[in-house]
Amino acid sequence: DFYGSGSSKTGHHTPLGSDRFKEGSAVSSIQALMNLGVKPEKIIIGAAFYIKTFKEVENINNGLDQNAVSSRSYNQINFEEVRSDFNFHWDASANAPYAYDSINKIFATFDDHKSIQLKSQYALEHNLGGIMFWQLMNDKKQNGLLKTMVDAIKEN
């Protein structure tokens, strides 16, 4: 995770690309490994089937790159219980989704269907060893992120 329980600012915890604020991403990490001589087929890209949240986040830039206090993690199932409180956004430079609850001042970072599809395609296009996720019990039983991952791999 690029952002999580030790972070004092919000950010994407599992971005494919680098966002406009930070350099950490799956792509930059993969490139760093390849620059060290690691063969692409030995590299596995990761995806998160859980949501990290931050509280006490000011309503600036929809909560992205703001001072915050790390809060809790959700799985895909229990996040549905609070989903209606959030406005969802897509960061095109990071290829990552995020959400912000302006009433409760909570920022959420996660992978979604689109980011999982992009990561799966990236793994295939760059001849990586594969894609992994953590953790299956956090996914929905119907139309979850694993299905998106499998479908993206089958399509390519």
Feature roles, as predicted:
Residues 1-79:
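Substrate-binding surface in catalytic domains of secreted glycosidases
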Residues 44-122, 148-156:
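Glycan-binding loop/region signatures in secreted carbohydrate-active enzymes
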Residues 17-20, 104-111, 132-133:
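Active-site rim elements
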Residues 136-142:
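Acidic-and-aromatic substrate-binding clefts and catalytic sites of carbohydrate-active enzymes
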Residues 48-49, 134-136:
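Acidic carboxylate-rich catalytic motifs and surrounding loops in phosphoryl-/glycosyl-chemistry enzymes
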Residues 42-44, 129-132:
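Beta-sheet entry/capping signal
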Residues 23-31, 116-120, 143-146, 150:
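Extracytoplasmic/secreted envelope proteins and their assembly/folding machinery
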Residues 122-130:
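Conserved, well-ordered alpha-helix/loop/beta-strand core segments that scaffold catalytic motifs
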